[in-house]
């Protein structure tokens, strides 16, 4: 799901920043429309229209992540476009595709990877929420949301049925957030100074 959002958002963000003008305006307004919906509501709407399966849940979660990655990529691309080495490359006639692949994309890579690490934790939470509501993974497919939902009926007699997957979910999300912070410290050159 994160790969879908990362790929789609990176393509849209670089396209919007590189071409600018009307294309930039249209793509970013489309991203603003997607951003205007709460993530869980948009996921429920997409799951209701696509049907309940783990693949559809991945697609819905991926669509939710596209605007965030698009905005991040657009901002980094616009920053790179103002650099003198890129202006020099344009002046000597370097093609647009070479500029994107050799100059812009490597500079976008660091922030996008950090965002992806944090997005993994949110994707796990969204999938668990959808499965808890009965819209994500369906039994007997394993999902922490399904396990928490199953244990809900036995919470007074056997709280560990819901507590164990809840703690596993917490540890997974916490771990991905720590990983994202570590990657940011490693890949952000401004913090290394």
Q: Locations of the language-model features?
A:
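Alpha-helical transmembrane segments of integral membrane proteins
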Residues: 1-193
């Amino acid at each position: 799901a994160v790969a879908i959002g990362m790929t789609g958002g990176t393509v849209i963000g670089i396209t919007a920043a590189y071409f600018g003008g009307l294309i930039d305006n249209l793509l970013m307004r489309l991203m603003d429309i997607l951003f205007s919906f709460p993530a869980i509501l948009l996921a429920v709407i997409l799951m209701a229209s696509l049907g309940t399966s783990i693949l559809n849940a991945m697609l819905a979660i991926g669509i939710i992540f596209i605007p965030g990655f698009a905005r991040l990529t657009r901002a980094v691309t616009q920053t790179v476009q103002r650099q003198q080495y890129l202006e020099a490359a344009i002046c000597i006639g370097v093609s647009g595709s070479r500029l994107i692949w050799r100059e812009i994309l490597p500079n976008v890579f660091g922030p996008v990877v950090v965002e992806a690490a944090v997005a993994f934790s949110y994707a796990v939470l969204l999938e668990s929420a959808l499965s808890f509501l009965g819209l994500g993974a369906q039994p007997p497919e394993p999902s922490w949301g399904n396990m928490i939902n199953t244990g809900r009926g036995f919470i007074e007699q056997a709280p560990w049925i819901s507590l164990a997957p809840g703690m596993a979910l917490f540890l997974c999300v916490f771990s991905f957030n720590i990983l994202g912070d570590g990657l940011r410290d490693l890949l952000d050159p401004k913090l290394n100074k």
